[in-house]
Curated annotation (Swiss-Prot):
Membrane attack complex (MAC) assembly is inhibited by CD59, thereby protecting self-cells from damage during complement activation. MAC assembly is also inhibited by clusterin (CLU) chaperones that inhibit polymerization of C9. Its main location: secreted. The gene is C8g. Belongs to the calycin superfamily. Lipocalin family. Disulfide bonds join 96-188. It is found in: Secreted; Target cell membrane. This is Complement component C8 gamma chain. Heterotrimer of 3 chains: alpha (C8A), beta (C8B) and gamma (C8G); the alpha and gamma chains are disulfide bonded. Component of the membrane attack complex (MAC), composed of complement C5b, C6, C7, C8A, C8B, C8G and multiple copies of the pore-forming subunit C9. InterPro entries: A1-microglobln, C8G, Calycin, Lipocalin_CS, Lipocln_cytosolic_FA-bd_dom. Coiled coil: none annotated.
Length: 202
């Protein structure tokens, strides 16, 4: 049985690679996320605040096998200089957990790196499309595989936003069968000190 930390790690990261294996980088190849354009004139100040995770497109085997364990997930973002301090909240066995991360500045607005203790190397993240007020589409890459996430400020989700997300998923060479939709109820926003995972580099 997976430990609570392991379950949180996989469900929060939701990348499409096997994190326990080292992926060889083909000579002369480019990183998949390098072809993804960040939101034009991205503003961390406008992006700050609360986001609700709606769906993830990924070929991750863990998602296919453990998707039934998905829980409502909330993300809080706050600018920290050129970086962003991020806290993710979700329940596990009825208890609210918090994962703290720092999305580090890469020098390109809308592009970030963050560290995860169980991953081999940094995770790349791009805010590809957002209107700041209603939705945001994020790409993550670890192990040279992409996952696509849809966040919203509030529910329900506009059909036009879902159309944009599904198009982005297809463009990432993923199928609709590889989309996991998260619960729309049961969100939590606070965790006690015993249920906080701190992934911020020290």
């Amino acid at each position: 049985m997976l430990s609570p930390g392991a379950v949180l790690f996989f469900t929060l990261l939701l990348t499409a690679s096997s994190l326990g294996q080292r992926t060889r980088k083909p000579i002369g190849s480019t990183s998949p996320i390098s072809t993804i354009q960040a939101q034009v004139n991205f503003s961390a100040q406008k992006f700050a605040g609360t986001w609700l995770l709606v769906a993830v497109g990924s070929s991750c085997r863990f998602l296919q096998e453990q998707g039934h364990r998905a829980e409502a997930t909330t993300l809080h973002a706050a600018p920290q200089g050129a970086a962003m301090a991020v806290s993710t909240f979700r329940k596990l066995d009825g208890i609210c957990w918090q994962v703290r991360q720092l999305f580090e500045n890469t020098g390109v607005p809308g592009r970030f790196l963050f560290q995860v203790s169980r991953a081999r190397g940094p995770v790349h993240m791009v805010v590809a499309e957002t209107d700041y007020q209603s939705f945001a589409i994020l790409y993550l890459e670890q192990g040279r595989k992409l996952s696509v996430k849809l966040y919203v400020r509030s529910l329900p989700v506009n059909d036009s936003v879902l159309d944009v997300f599904e198009r982005r998923v297809r463009e990432a060479n993923l199928t609709e069968d590889q989309i996991l939709f998260f619960p729309k109820y049961g969100f939590c926003e606070t965790a006690d000190q015993l249920h906080i995972l701190n992934e911020v580099p020290r």
